[in-house]
């Protein structure tokens, strides 16, 4: 009986958040262990189904860098990185699109549909809803920077109660162009801004932003982030994550979250509890 009462209490505790977030758009950047570990995949799908069922509108943007590198190595195609960004040659671009749009995207869509969601996979090339330009063609090849997002494509899918799953491939306005490989974090932040999402949530392999003692920092502002960058507290791979958060905030997203995707049901714990489990980034 005690366990049953606890279940009821958990539902009651979540109710204010369910009411608050009903009909709101949440953009979720899906990556890291949550995307590769089978048990975590199942928990992620359950979380998305629950969000979907209670009236929240999840939009998923996924990465796939590890699998891209794995396939490139298998095919003996050289791949290099500059400042953490992949150099995308024409040969690499072909594999990037194959893996992101043709492999990982469909795997996620199938996973969600098998759990009862109504998911549909798209890339920025579909209806040219994401267009881009070269970041620096001489240096990065077909690695791109987003120029424009047409939010109506995703809004139409949401209106029809689909869960959009977006592969970070952008179109070019040039006929016959292979398109652009887009950093998934930055793609997610741009999509969130274009959709005027309530939240953007990044699933990572870290608890969030940590201080110099390794303790979780639960709340950050742009001013605090700049200070922590200067003193080296925020460094390495966390820099592009917080930059993506700030870009989303600047585009009008209310809150950005960096959470540990290795924790089962991390999305629900962050969204439906007062304390959350990760770092939230606020405007101002």
From Swiss-Prot:
Its EC number is 2.7.2.8. Keywords: Amino-acid biosynthesis, Arginine biosynthesis, ATP-binding, Cytoplasm, Kinase, Nucleotide-binding, Transferase. The keyword NADP does not apply. Its main location: cytoplasm. It catalyses: N-acetyl-L-glutamate + ATP = N-acetyl-L-glutamyl 5-phosphate + ADP. The keyword Transcription does not apply. Coiled coil: none annotated. Disulfide bonds: none annotated. It comes from the Bacteria. InterPro entries: AceGlu_kinase-like_sf (IPR036393), AcgluKinase_fam (IPR004662), ArgB (IPR037528), Asp/Glu/Uridylate_kinase (IPR001048), Glu/AcGlu_kinase (IPR001057), NAGK-C (IPR041727). Pathway: Amino-acid biosynthesis; L-arginine biosynthesis; N(2)-acetyl-L-ornithine from L-glutamate: step 2/4. Catalyzes the ATP-dependent phosphorylation of N-acetyl-L-glutamate. This is Acetylglutamate kinase. It comes from Nitratiruptor sp. (strain SB155-2). The lineage of its organism: Bacteria, Pseudomonadati, Campylobacterota, Epsilonproteobacteria, Nautiliales.
């Amino acid at each position: 009986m005690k366990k049953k009462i606890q279940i009821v209490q958990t539902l009651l505790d979540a109710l204010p958040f369910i009411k608050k977030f009903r009909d709101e758009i949440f953009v979720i950047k899906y990556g890291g262990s949550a995307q590769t570990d089978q048990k975590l995949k199942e928990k992620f799908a359950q979380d998305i189904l629950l969000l979907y069922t209670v009236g929240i509108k999840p939009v998923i943007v996924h990465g796939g860098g590890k699998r891209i590198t794995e396939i490139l190595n298998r095919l003996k195609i050289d791949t290099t990185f500059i400042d953490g960004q992949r150099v995308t040659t024409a040969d690499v671009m072909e594999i990037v699109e194959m893996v992101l749009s043709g492999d990982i995207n469909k795997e996620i869509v199938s996973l969600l549909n098998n759990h009862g969601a109504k998911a549909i996979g798209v890339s920025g090339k579909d209806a040219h809803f994401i267009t881009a330009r070269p970041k620096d063609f001489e240096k990065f090849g077909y690695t791109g920077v987003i120029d424009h997002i047409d939010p109506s494509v995703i809004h139409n899918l949401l209106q029809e109660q689909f869960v959009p799953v977006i592969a970070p491939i952008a179109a070019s306005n040039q006929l016959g162009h292979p398109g652009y490989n887009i950093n998934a974090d930055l793609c997610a932040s741009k999509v969130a801004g274009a959709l005027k999402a309530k939240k953007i949530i990044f699933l990572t392999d870290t608890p969030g932003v940590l201080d110099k003692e390794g303790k979780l920092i639960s709340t950050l502002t742009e001013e605090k982030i700049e200070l922590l960058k200067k003193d080296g507290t925020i460094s390495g791979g966390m820099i592009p994550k917080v930059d993506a958060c700030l870009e989303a905030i600047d585009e009008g997203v209310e809150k950005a979250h960096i959470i540990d995707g290795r924790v089962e049901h991390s999305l629900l714990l962050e969204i439906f509890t007062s304390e959350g489990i990760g770092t939230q980034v606020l405007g101002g």
